[in-house]
Amino acid sequence: MTANVTKLEDNKVRLDVEVPPEAVREGVEAKLRELRKQVRVPGFRPGKAPRRVLETHLGRDYIYMEALQESLPAWYSRAVIDADIRPIDRPEIHFDDPLDEKKGFRFSATVEVRPEARLGEYKGLEVPKREVEVTEEQVEERLEELRGQFATLAAVEDRPVREGDFVILDFKGERMAGGELPGAEAEDYMLEVGRGELLEDFEKNLVGMKAGERKQFAVTFPMDYREESLRGQSVLFRVHVKEIKERDLPPLDDEFAKEASEFETLEELRAAIREQLEEAARRRAEGEFRARVLEAVAERAEVEVPEVMVEDKAEEMVRSFERSVSAQGIKPEDYYRIAGTGREEFKRQVRDDAADTVKKELVLDAVVAAEGIEADEEAVRHEIEHLAEDSGRSPEEVEKSLRENGTYALLREELARQKALDFLVEHARAVPMPPEDEQMPGSGEEPGGGEGVVEARVESAAETEAERDEEGESR
């Protein structure tokens, strides 16, 4: 099979493809074998009707049309690989002549391809990097958090509720305008007052109440409340505080260190906490630096981001989010309902991030091309083994599946991008961060990839390819 490429305007190319006679015959024979099993021909057992009888029974044109519909996607995919192009949308297929088992078959495919970013300066850039510093206050805060995990709850009888207390209460709410309020009722509910688990005004009304006291008060739901039907609604709550409890914190001493950790003394525990905080701070600073390096390179590059790529990326981000929500046992449609939004609205919200991500991916692709970067075979094997472990299949099965659905190339592409980002970071010059930026929280996000991101993108791309194949078959 041969495929010639002609560049067109607007990032499009035309593939002129010639399918040899033997490939056409293979496609027709494959379809005939399938039809023999499906079609009942009087006088013949299923699967035994000869070709001439099937042609008489169904018509040669029908058989050729079915064979073409079955074979064309594979021929197009083969041509894309042979021509070394990277389509980003569905092709427009055109042909003049029908299948011919003696002459072969010719068709053209016009398709939009991935644009190439024009890199500006990308090596030796000066990029601010945050200094890693852990204060004594941070160590003490972490120590207090650990101390809180070993606290016990002691009953309070000689004072009313105050912030930080735990209360056990019954409550029931009903609309001030009349009518029940589903879900606004509980018995023996334990609440940490002031933590923000329930409405702020609800928790504030508990402060000052005593054990055994009953009270009713009105609360108005804020206009940005997650449940749209409750926004701005006034609700009357009847509350019965049954018990008040307060934290009884253990003393900070060597005995606590032994109970809470593998260390013998409090000072050893403090040192370990500092080391953990410093390591976490280093990771955040490195992640932020990598993001800043990529941002600096992207700012100096020129690239037009196609709308179809933004749409695909936004869909990928939504699907990744929905997988994450589902993994927590929450149905995506339930999440959208509770959050007062919908899937399409959520997709609109992530479009700017999607466009930014696509631009940076195109920039990394340009670095890959400029520096001749390739994915490491060891890294490819590692990702395939990781995917196999998650799916309960063998690495060989996973690799075969990735190659068949066209996402093996995507895996290598994503790993090459990560390697390109490593290259950019290695060739950047870290400079002290300006004081005004030091006050901003750092980002530990791995730009362009990271643990789990490759797998998510491969899965999402496989789903998208499957949907496109289905749509192609239906046309």
From Swiss-Prot:
GO molecular function: peptidyl-prolyl cis-trans isomerase activity; protein folding chaperone; ribosome binding
Segments forming domain PPIase FKBP-type: 164-250
Keyword Mitochondrion in record: no
Catalytic activity: [protein]-peptidylproline (omega=180) = [protein]-peptidylproline (omega=0)
Enzyme class: isomerase
Protein's cellular compartments: Cytoplasm
Biased composition (Acidic residues): 462-475
Gene3D superfamilies associated with the record: 3.10.50.40, Trigger factor ribosome-binding domain, Trigger factor, C-terminal domain
Keywords assigned by UniProt, alphabetized: Cell cycle, Cell division, Chaperone, Cytoplasm, Isomerase, Rotamase
A biological-process GO annotation: 'de novo' cotranslational protein folding
Biological role: Involved in protein export. Acts as a chaperone by maintaining the newly synthesized protein in an open conformation. Functions as a peptidyl-prolyl cis-trans isomerase.
UniProt xrefs under HAMAP family: Trigger_factor_Tig
This protein's domain notes: Consists of 3 domains; the N-terminus binds the ribosome, the middle domain has PPIase activity, while the C-terminus has intrinsic chaperone activity on its own.
Protein name, entry field: Trigger factor
Upper classification of the organism: Bacteria, Bacillati, Actinomycetota, Rubrobacteria, Rubrobacterales
